[in-house]
UniProtKB/Swiss-Prot annotation:
Record's protein name: GTP cyclohydrolase 1
Gene: folE
Keywords per UniProt: GTP-binding, Hydrolase, Metal-binding, Nucleotide-binding, One-carbon metabolism, Zinc
Catalytic activity: GTP + H2O = 7,8-dihydroneopterin 3'-triphosphate + formate + H(+)
PANTHER family: GTP CYCLOHYDROLASE 1, GTP CYCLOHYDROLASE I
Keyword Zinc on entry: yes
Assembly, per entry: Homomer.
Classification of source organism: Bacteria, Pseudomonadati, Pseudomonadota, Gammaproteobacteria, Cellvibrionales
Species whose genome carries this gene: Teredinibacter turnerae (strain ATCC 39867 / T7901)
Length: 184
């Protein structure tokens, strides 16, 4: 029979020589398993469930920007967190996405094992697909604990990734407007 996640955590902790019966570690394997399940809960969600018909008709074709959306994810290489914020912009063509759904799309993908570059593109392509937007821009900036706690141990480094689709890629003035709105 396959071991439970809590049993796997117990084995991992025991492999360090720790005593699972000491007061500070009693229950830790179960808590760690519950935390990991939450941190990877994006695998159990679909775009359809997250968006949940929150697309609304709109005559606006002006840029929509949501910035400073907090996020956390687990790097697929070391399973250590990266923590940061996302900035999303899009140009609607007849419909707009409910504001909270932008954040929920980010959370759905962030709660999976992956890399920041992939997360950025997943968010951009999903918003483009769901809204039919003329263009989408996504920028994510994050600190990676895999670089801060181990390896080169650089605590002040920030990684920035971007995905520009449609008019955000093809039109310099659209991209410039997006970047200017992020800096105000």
């Amino acid at each position: 029979m396959k071991p439970t996640p809590a049993e796997l955590y117990a084995n991992l902790i025991s492999s360090t020589g720790e005593d699972l019966q000491r007061p500070g570690l009693q229950g830790t394997p179960a808590r760690a398993a519950t935390a990991f399940e939450y941190l990877t809960s994006g695998y159990k969600q679909s775009v359809q469930e997250v968006v949940n018909d929150a697309l609304f008709p709109s005559d606006s074709n002006d840029m929509v920007v949501v910035r400073d959306i907090e996020l956390f994810s687990l790097c697929e290489h070391h399973m250590l967190p990266f923590i940061g914020k996302a900035h999303v912009g899009y140009i609607p063509t007849g419909k707009v996405l409910g504001l909270s759904k932008v954040a929920r799309i980010i959370d759905m993908y962030a709660r999976r094992l992956q890399i920041q570059e992939q997360l950025t593109h997943q968010v951009a392509s999903t918003i483009a697909e769901v809204t039919g937007a003329a263009g989408v821009g996504v920028i994510i900036e994050a600190k990676h604990l895999c670089m801060m706690m181990r390896g080169v141990e650089k605590q002040n480094s920030v990684m920035k990734t971007s995905a520009m689709l449609g008019s955000f890629r093809a039109n310099l003035s659209t991209r410039s407007e997006f970047l200017a709105l992020l800096n105000n």
